[in-house]
Design a protein with these regions (language model features):
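Short, structured active-site "lid" loops
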Residues: 1-11
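Structural motif
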Residues: 1-2, 28-31, 56-59, 143-146, ...
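Glycine/small-residue-rich loop that forms an oxyanion/phosphate-binding "nest" at active or ligand-binding sites
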Residues: 12-61
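Conserved phosphate/ATP/ADP-binding segment of small-molecule kinases
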Residues: 42-160
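Short, small-residue alpha-helix embedded
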Residues: 68, 174-204
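Short, well-structured alpha-helical segments that form the helix of a local strand-helix-strand
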Residues: 133-138, 195-210, 229-230
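Short pre-catalytic strand/loop immediately N-terminal to key active-site residues, enriched for Gly-Thr
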Residues: 163-175
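Charged C-terminal helix
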Residues: 208-250
Length: 250
């Protein structure tokens, strides 16, 4: 089950809660994609509700989305300074902290709609700190945390895969991250005994597909690249992934 906040509205919240709880009861994989969680209080409150009521096997988002989740676990009433979007629908105010949320030092969230804030970008210079923060959040939430961007991080709180696959054009394709969350869910469901490795493989796969799409589309533009990306995902196999995956474990 992949719970995605991308097209969130009031009516979808009970459905996501019920689906998540039932998936937990049945022992099915549940993944959270907190799309644009830092963009409005409505999205933040919904994410808080889901984190409190549903046990997630993995959470995948860009760095700003993950940092916002971390700030929610740290201080429930904390607001982002970049909350430029306001949803008109209200949700019931949450007054109880989730048992698995606690103060996470050094992590604060900002957002730019569904895009990562440039100031949050994971770079070689700040990589060690981001790895530390990601591991801390993973331990607090007791779930795999996958942070995707120019450098991808996938951690279970103990080990962290640092993945360097991908192409800058992927950031110009709306829905590429959501596509990855679907792939991640499928990989986890197929490999329930090796969830960290499965999550890392999913992220590597999407990055490899992005590289192959860039080779195929050349300078044709983002429309051609989008189609080439979907083609590359559909044509991916184990051999291509093994040859193309670039990662280290820290």
């Amino acid at each position: 089950l992949n719970l995605n906040l991308g097209t969130l509205n009031q009516k979808k919240i009970p459905a996501m809660q019920k689906a998540g709880k039932m998936a937990n009861k049945l022992g099915h994989v549940v993944v959270l994609d907190p799309v644009g969680v830092g963009a409005s209080s409505f999205r933040k409150q919904t994410a808080e509700q889901l984190l409190k009521e549903v046990r997630f096997d993995a959470i995948r988002g860009n760095i700003s989305e993950i940092k916002t989740l971390a700030s929610l676990c740290g201080t429930q009433e904390k607001n982002s300074g970049n909350m430029a979007v306001s949803d008109t629908m209200d949700v019931e105010k949450i007054t109880d902290k989730s048992d698995h949320c606690g103060k996470i030092t050094g992590i604060d969230g900002s957002g730019r709609g569904v895009d990562a804030d440039n100031a949050d970008t994971v770079t070689e210079e700040n990589l060690a700190q981001h790895i530390s923060n990601a591991k801390m959040l993973s331990k607090k939430l007791q779930t795999i945390v996958a942070i995707t961007g120019a450098i991808d991080l996938v951690t279970d709180g103990s080990s962290c895969y640092v993945i360097r696959n991908g192409n800058p054009q992927m950031g110009h394709v709306t829905g590429a991250g959501c596509q990855l969350s679907g792939i991640l869910t499928a990989f986890l469901a197929a490999n329930p005994e090796n969830k960290l490795q499965a999550a890392a493989a999913a992220v590597c796969m999407m990055g490899c597909a992005g590289e192959l799409a860039a080779e195929k589309s050349g300078q044709s533009g983002s429309g051609t690249y989008r189609v080439s990306l979907m083609d590359a995902v559909s044509c991916m196999d184990g051999d291509i992934l093994e040859r193309g995956a670039r990662y280290e474990i820290r």
